[in-house]
């Protein structure tokens, strides 16, 4: 089809596009920055990426636009074997304590993504 999409290799959206997109060529690169550079240099037609970074690009160049509906949602999770209540309890306490103690919030601030990602509320 002649359509080329820049994508950060091994990202969640790379996996999704690989499984679901059949009529375009994925151009895989080693960093998010490299994928954005390919797009800015007109070496690809489309840039796949996370919405906050795409919004940053749109603010810098009013010739860019973004589809409004995301094509996938990234939901992170942890898997354990059934019948391991002590492991489930450990993971739940670990996550809950790190949220309550502010560690997760401090990591978001450290990486300057506190306005881009959210933390679930813990009772």
Describe each PLM feature range:
Residues 10-19:
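Aromatic-rich, solvent-exposed beta-strand/loop patch
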Residues 9-11, 30-32, 48-55, 101:
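Beta->alpha turn/N-cap motifs
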Residues 12, 27-38, 74:
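Short helix-initiation/N-cap motifs at beta->coil->alpha
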Residues 1-11:
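Short loop->beta-strand "edge-of-pocket" segments that line small-molecule binding or catalytic clefts
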Residues 51, 55-111, 114-123:
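Periplasmic-binding protein-like
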Residues 19-20, 32-48, 52, 60-61:
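Short helices/loops that flank or line small-molecule/ion binding pockets
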């Amino acid at each position: 089809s002649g359509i080329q999409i820049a994508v950060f290799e091994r990202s969640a959206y790379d996996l999704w596009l690989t499984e679901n997109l059949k009529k375009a060529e994925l151009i895989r690169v080693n960093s998010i920055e490299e994928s954005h550079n390919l797009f800015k240099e007109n070496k690809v037609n489309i840039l796949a990426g996370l919405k906050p970074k795409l919004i940053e690009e749109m603010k810098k160049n009013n010739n860019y636009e973004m589809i409004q509906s995301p094509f996938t949602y990234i939901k992170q999770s942890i898997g354990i074997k059934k019948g391991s209540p002590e492991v489930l309890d450990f993971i739940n306490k670990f996550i809950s304590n790190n949220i309550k103690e502010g560690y997760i919030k401090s990591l978001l601030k450290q990486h300057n993504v506190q306005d881009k990602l959210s933390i679930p509320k813990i009772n």
